[in-house]
Amino acid sequence: MIYNSFLKRHFRKNIVYIFFIVLTPKCLIAQTDPAFKPISADIIKLSSKVLDEDRKIYIYIPPVDTLLPDKRYPVLYVLDGDNHFSLIAEYCRYLSRKDVNVMPEIIIVGIPNKNRTRDLTPTNSIIDYDGKPDTSSNSRFKSSGGGNNFLQFIGAELIPYVDAHYKTQPFKIFAGHSFGGITTINCLLTQPDMFSAYIAISPSFWWDKEYLLSLADEKLKNDRDINKMIFYSDADEGMSESTFHTNLLKFDSIVIQRKIVGLDHKYAYYPEDTHMTEPVKAYYDALRFIFRQWDLPLTDLKSLNATVVKQHYQQLSQRYGYSVTPPEVNVHNIAMYLIAQYGALDNAISLLEMNTQNYPASATAFSQLGDAYLKKGDRSKAVICYKKALALKPGLQNVKAKLAGASENQ
């Protein structure tokens, strides 16, 4: 986090550190202490014509931003929603907090299973993990092969429903584990434009005599442009020679050797984890990979101003395909840091002016900008800001007092 990095790099002497603690808002030097609220979700029933059945769906929505009531959010769709929905929702909720700020707030759509083998396998096959046919009367593989039909359900029915009923951005992530992993890979290979980023945790490439490895070899050509992100991983699923591990190395080799334009990829191996514990680490690492450029990079702190911050968020907007707005609280904290540490009042004012432009309904933004103008000695501009803050929120007694003080001797 950029604020912690500020402290580690720039506050070597205790006396300076103590001075900074006195002058700086708490959230710049430590985590905030928000009231605990358990994850809650909308639970909907979607009648699918594609699947000819009703499907239960879990949907987590970030808290309403009162300053940006029309704010829209990226969406993460996760398979095995009955197992992984709450885990991912908690990760996203924490990592998007204002005092963490390494990813955006995001809508989570969990897709619980109804017939997992049917929906999460791309072909019909009765060949098991050991390469032997399961011809028993109760073979769990008999219903397999509905994966492409399931992707049609997601693309033609689920995504349109979510887009119609929730405030979504175009950036979408598709995440899955094991059979869910080959489902996300199959989507990337056959319908890459359905999602912007893909997560495949221990994908079951063994399925149907490594069908998807052959498909990857066919589809991932170096003359293709695939402007997507993909994170894939495996764990200790039978030592280093396990089918999961060797097959994922084959897939990774295809991705690396083809050097596909625009395909941003990362492979992670978790030898100390099992097939079922791996998602706890892998989903976190996948989110950090996809949004690794989200926070402001460390730079020459004296040069931080509105131009630098705007440029960073313009780059994020281009990367993720929607307009990304700098968080009001974080911009204010950077401005206060610049004043306390460098006396860089003009740079701080440029940041606070940007806040009033991005958050025109925020009385706090105008009040804080008024404080900065007053500190500079520009009473007339301070008065304008205080009046604007009071117009937005008339009951602010502290702002009324500031306005009275700034108006004297004008």
Predicted regions and their residues:
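Residue-level recognition of tetratricopeptide repeat
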Residues: M336-Y337, D371-L374, G405
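The feature captures the conserved acid-bearing segment of alpha/beta-hydrolase catalytic domains
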Residues: W206-Y269, D273
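Active-site machinery of serine-nucleophile hydrolases
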Residues: N83-L151
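A domain-start/cap signature at the N-terminus of enzymes
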Residues: A30-P74
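C-terminal catalytic histidine-bearing segment of alpha/beta-hydrolase fold enzymes
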Residues: H245, L249-D252, R258-V324
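Helix-start (N-cap) detector for alpha-helical repeat units in TPR-like alpha-solenoids
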Residues: V324, E328, L345, A363-T364, ...
